[in-house]
Amino acid sequence: MDNALEFVNSRLGTHEYWDKFYDEELTNFEKNGGEGEIWFGRLCEAKMVEFLIKKASKDAIICDIGTGNGSVLRKLSNCGFLNLFGIDYSYKAIELAKNISSKNYSNNKIKFLLANISEDKLESELKGKFDILLDKGTFDAISLTNKSDLDDEIPRNELINLLENELLCFDCELPTNNNFEFGGCKGNTYIGCVFKWRG
């Protein structure tokens, strides 16, 4: 693909990094009850939830890919969404998400599952199950993986296999050219994108 984005390898693209990160987050939660990092901030998460409230049925079967601590799913649950799943390839992330949800959200029925979309072996029980997929950072992590360790087609194919009929995928990590400067630092804002798959 001539216009493909080029990313450099980074420790953020390694399984070891995320296991260590979520091990520390889990320790912090057990010590002080803090839920930990909200990737791209609460505003980004709020925009995802706001969009889904407007556009999706409360009965839609939603999967958060790379769920981390499960924060966005808890927000959706609080807004009345009923069929929520979070998958992550880090066992510690899944343990953290389950612990937070069971301790702080006693009525929460979110299902958290250990799964790796960058491997061609997702559990058959997940295939063809979901109406909506959410991504708030997983594309970044996959893009930063050592390319010799990753077949570029597998994540795309595995995502398609997760879907029942149509895909509504909310990806809120794509950088824009909208630059700004504040306090002597330069930065970019982020945008949200929704993709609909018709197979």
Feature-to-residue mapping (PLM):
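Preference for well-ordered, secondary-structure-rich cores of eukaryotic proteins
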Residues: 1-199
